[in-house]
Amino acid sequence: LTDTVALSDAVQWAVDNVDLEETLILVTADHSHTMTISGYPRRGNPILGTVETEPGKPLLDATGAPYTTLSYANGPGYKKQRPNLSTIDTKAPDYQQLGTVPMPAETHAGEDVAAFAAGQNAGAVRGVMEQNRLYDVMYDVLIND
């Protein structure tokens, strides 16, 4: 999650240091990953914690065990038998989120990725778009400058 914080800081720096009437800031990715947020954590639930309906009250899965907010479809966090998370500090720096399929590393996924824009021509970035359309949005800014 430190990369997410660094990206947020970089985007904020750009917003604070450019003229948005003359500049397009476009943030996107070329792929997604298999990390997901699982089933109904309350607003404000610790992102690295177990899912809770209210503070101190974990939501339990079909086997009666708590589960983490974040998990991976694959990766090094696979465990042959899922550990009892009620006795594990999932927010500890050395805790590794669970993965469903054993892999040496987590892989890319295939869903659409978000694109966020601010500034000149940002209104052209909306809804579901083909990735190559983002080039046209950037090109329009360049030729209409």
Question: What annotation goes with each model-predicted range?
Answer:
Residues 1-145:
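A post-motif C-terminal structural segment
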